[in-house]
Amino acid sequence: MLMNRFVLKRVRQGKPLNKPRLSIFCSHKHIYAQIIDDMVGRTLVSASTYHYKQGWHSTMKDAQEVGQKLAQQALEKGIQQVVLDRGSYRYHGKIRALAEAARKEGLKI
């Protein structure tokens, strides 16, 4: 079995592998979020402001909308629990707004 660096990191830290991860990326113009199953290596659900809005949309309100849409899509596909992968970002501002909006919609993080 080929393991990527995210799987190896979770094994080393003793964290469960049965949950997909919610990966968040913020550019200057847009916010991107996707739920990834690292054991299979596939993106299960994705949402971003790039697909919904034109122009510069990287505010906290836009992050909340992305979190809501991502959670709705995930629950439709039967995904109820995820692990938050915020990368190098602090849990503050847009990252926090996206995560809390996803929690309000029923996704367990």
From Swiss-Prot:
SUPFAM superfamilies: Translational machinery components
Coarse class of the protein's main subcellular location: plastid
Keyword rRNA-binding recorded: yes
GO biological process: one example: translation
Keyword Ribonucleoprotein assigned: yes
Entry's Gene Ontology molecular function annotations: 5S rRNA binding; structural constituent of ribosome
GO terms under cellular component: chloroplast; ribonucleoprotein complex; ribosome
Gene3D superfamilies membership: 3.30.420.100
Disulfide-bond pairs as recorded: none
Keywords, sorted A to Z: Chloroplast, Plastid, Ribonucleoprotein, Ribosomal protein, RNA-binding, rRNA-binding
Location(s) in or outside the cell: Plastid, Chloroplast
InterPro entries cross-referenced by the UniProt entry: Ribosomal_uL18_bac-type (IPR004389), Ribosomal_uL18_bac/euk (IPR005484)
Record-linked NCBIfam families: L18_bact
Function: Binds 5S rRNA, forms part of the central protuberance of the 50S subunit.
UniProt subunit comment: Part of the 50S ribosomal subunit; contacts the 5S rRNA.
Family to which the UniProt record says this protein belongs: Belongs to the universal ribosomal protein uL18 family.
Protein name: Large ribosomal subunit protein uL18c
Organism: Cyanidioschyzon merolae (strain NIES-3377 / 10D)
